[in-house]
């Protein structure tokens, strides 16, 4: 019995002394470094004026090529990077949000989080709140608007989770300070309650010009209401 105890003690000491492997990060920020540096180079070449409207998020923001033309008279800045999740956008807040001191952030992200299986709707909604806290630490007066998860054929099987994300963010926005919810979901559905035909690219995931025309209308209505 004495030998067994000594063996157990020695084994415990060896385990305690052994190096412990760190948990792998939940995502690879290095994959976005080229995108972020491209933004920074553009900023050095043409420094944006503070107080504008920053559009941030994933590929649906990045691919909005007509953004400036869609909202004439508004100083808009596009800092979307494709495939990103909310936690990744949050990690880059010091580099692609805070330097611009925006008066308003229009944010679209969260669908990749759910589609990848890495986050539930509840977790993605919590991640958005973390994004807000990250911004508000330095920019307490900045208003932030969340564009709802959009329906599309490629991820229609995930619609319940997407709608749950929308519900959670909408509910929070009703009581949170200067947090708004822009609901594009209904406008993107056809008469049968499924995603409209003809507003998506061949991948049935990303929008074409007709899809962005819907966003232009819905987001434009929101921006006009802010001026009232």
Features from the language model and the residues they span:
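Charged helix-capping and loop-helix junction motifs
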Residues: 121-129, 161-166
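N-terminal secretory targeting modules
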Residues: 1-55, 65, 69-70, 224-228
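Oxyanion-hole/transition-state-stabilizing segment in secreted/luminal serine hydrolases
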Residues: 61-77, 86-125, 149-153
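Generic structural signal for well-ordered alpha-helices
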Residues: 93, 128-133, 166, 170
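Cell-envelope and extracellular/periplasmic
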Residues: 80-82, 104-119, 129, 133, ...
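Short hydrophobic segments within beta-strands
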Residues: 56-57, 147
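A short helix->loop->beta-strand "cap" motif at the edges of active sites that frequently abuts
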Residues: 139-143
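Catalytic His-Asp segment of secreted/periplasmic serine-dependent ester chemistry enzymes
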Residues: 150-228
């Amino acid at each position: 019995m004495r030998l067994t105890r000594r063996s157990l003690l020695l084994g415990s000491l060896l385990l305690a002394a052994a190096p412990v492997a760190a948990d792998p990060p939940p995502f690879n920020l290095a994959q976005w470094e080229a995108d972020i540096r491209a933004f920074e180079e553009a900023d050095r070449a043409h420094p944006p004026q503070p107080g504008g409207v920053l559009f941030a998020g994933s590929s649906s923001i990045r691919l909005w090529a007509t953004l400036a033309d869609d909202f004439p008279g508004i100083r808009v800045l596009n800092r979307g990077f494709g495939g990103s999740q909310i936690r990744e956008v949050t990690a880059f807040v010091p580099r692609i949000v805070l330097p611009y001191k925006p008066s308003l952030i229009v944010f679209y992200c969260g669908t990749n989080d759910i589609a990848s299986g890495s986050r539930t709707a509840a977790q993605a909604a919590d991640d958005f709140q973390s994004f807000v806290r990250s911004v508000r630490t330095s920019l307490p007066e900045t208003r932030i608007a969340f564009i709802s998860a959009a329906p599309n054929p490629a991820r229609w099987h995930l619609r319940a989770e997407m709608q749950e994300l929308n519900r959670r963010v909408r509910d929070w926005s009703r009581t949170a300070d200067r947090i708004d919810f822009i609901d594009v979901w209904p406008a993107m559905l056809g008469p049968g309650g499924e995603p409209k035909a003809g507003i998506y690219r061949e991948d049935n995931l990303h929008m074409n010009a007709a899809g962005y025309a819907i966003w232009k209308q819905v987001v434009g209505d929101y921006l006009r209401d802010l001026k009232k």
